[in-house]
Amino acid sequence: MESYKPVWLKGAVILAINLIDKGYKPVAVGLGERDFYIDVKSDTSITLDEVKKAINENVLANVSIENNQIVYKGNKVSIIEDKVSISTNLNPKYFEILNISTHHPNPNEQYVRIRGVAFETEEQLKDYLTWLEKAEETDHRLIGEKLDLFSFHEEAGSGLVLFHPKGQTIRNELIAFMREINDSMGYQEVYTSHVFKTDIWKISGHYTLYRDKLIVFNMEGDEYGVKPMNCPAHILIYKSKPRTYRDLPIRFSEFGHVYRWEKKGELYGLLRVRGFVQDDGHIFLREDQLREEIKMLISKTVEVWHKFGFKDDDIKPYLSTRPDESIGSDELWEKATNALISALQESGLKFGIKEKEGAFYGPKIDFEIRDSLGRWWQLSTIQVDFNLPERFKLEYIDKDGIKKRPVMVHRAIYGSIDRFVAILLEHFKGKLPTWLSSVQVRVLPITDEVNEYAEKVLNDMRKRRIRAEIDYAGETLSKRIKNAYDQGVPYILIVGKKEASEGTVTVRARGNIEVRNVKFEKFLELLITEIAQRDVEQTTVKALK
């Protein structure tokens, strides 16, 4: 997806200029997750035919780009994009308008938002539209609505998600798994506030280099910011008491709520939000401990992705190097970069290089994961930081009694838990592994006469902490089976008079697999094991066949 964005942005610029030539007033262009967008100031709606007529001329004559604005015939159009630049080498000729909508930035103004894509060849466009049609069938926003997982509400604010009980169940399972991973590496979990005085962000450098994402407000004469990252708070915990070389490494973890003011046109379901939770971690350690710590993090990261069924070919690490806007000396950056390279090489992983895509305080390893639709998602990150310990004057007492600076490592394996939920929903097409499913078993009594037995089966599962529910015989059995499949329930237990008299169940699983005359206790034992082991496949039904 990322590889398409330069040509999309160029296409958006071309279309904006064409719209100006047709008498329209575009005010901004930008990129979404799957397309470009153009905001046009207009008191009336704009039809698809009108937009298509504006795609006839693809000439960038008499156009200049100044201060991230398109300047053309007295018009200035803002370019809402800071990661993708406009290339003179690209020549988009084939356009597709995907959507036209209206929104009101204030009560007195109306904008028409045009969403589309552009490619250099007709074949690229056709391939993308075919892929997009397939992707829309597994759109996490539609799955989330169908399965009652989460919702967004304009009155609550754009990019601010509300997780419903079933959606929160998925998040809780992801957090519980990561807690186990953290425990295995020796982390101590902390909690820090959502809001801090901006003094902390000024010391860290976020106030200057991350200012456009910071949400800042004034109260009682002091300036506060809603935290976009957890690292400065963890630094203050480290500073709260003296540390010695024997204490290191110190590993803090937090499922921290962070908030970043993403541009409205870039918001996209759970994939791009303004408030989310990170599985964050920070390690304070000596330089001589750095390489082994990074190697352990790399190993654990790969272990986690294997648990979700991703193969080695689906996992691609990148070394991201120093960006143009950064803090710290060349010497510190070189030292940090070399530590990451050594750990990657010793781990035996093939890795790519992303020039100038490191954090402003240090280089990093980013892991990209390929989903079932062939898309690559940047998720895990490991960042080495010599700079924030210097800026916050962190210290530990070395064995020779001298005060020294620790090194800091920032890491997140899921990245954003909310975003990871979206990726999993699309990757598994709403059919999550049993351990992650909000409802793991649905019991279907064939008639009301066996309700008592069905309820006993239900309650026995709930006592064993299995998320089970019952669908009584209000509709036909085939209709209830279809409903359970459509709602992503991994296991369906059908009980009739025969099952009630014999203490058995008929088990149905995904893929229209059915196993009859299964002793309920045997099913329960196998299911508990499948869930405890966090299997991706339905090992219970495999063992029963």
Swiss-Prot record:
Keywords: Aminoacyl-tRNA synthetase, ATP-binding, Cytoplasm, Ligase, Metal-binding, Nucleotide-binding, Protein biosynthesis, RNA-binding, tRNA-binding, Zinc. Transmembrane segments: none annotated. One of its GO terms (cellular component) is cytoplasm. Residues 139-433 are annotated as: Catalytic. It is found in: Cytoplasm. It comes from the Archaea. PROSITE patterns: AA_TRNA_LIGASE_II. It catalyses: tRNA(Thr) + L-threonine + ATP = L-threonyl-tRNA(Thr) + AMP + diphosphate + H(+). One of its GO terms (molecular function) is threonine-tRNA ligase activity. It holds the Pfam family HGTP_anticodon. Zn(2+) binds at residues 231, 282, 410. SUPFAM superfamilies: Class II aaRS ABD-related, Class II aaRS and biotin synthetases, ThrRS/AlaRS common domain. It is an enzyme of class 6 (ligase). Its cofactor is Zn(2+). GO terms for biological process: threonyl-tRNA aminoacylation. Its EC number is 6.1.1.3. Binds 1 zinc ion per subunit. Belongs to the class-II aminoacyl-tRNA synthetase family. PANTHER family: THREONINE--TRNA LIGASE, CHLOROPLASTIC_MITOCHONDRIAL 2 (PTHR11451:SF44), THREONINE-TRNA LIGASE (PTHR11451). Catalyzes the attachment of threonine to tRNA(Thr) in a two-step reaction: L-threonine is first activated by ATP to form Thr-AMP and then transferred to the acceptor end of tRNA(Thr). Also activates L-serine and transfers it to tRNA(Thr) but cannot deacylate incorrectly charged amino acid; unlike most archaea the editing function is found in a freestanding protein. Homodimer. Probably interacts with its editing subunit. This is Threonine--tRNA ligase catalytic subunit. The lineage of its organism: Archaea, Thermoproteota, Thermoprotei, Sulfolobales, Sulfolobaceae.
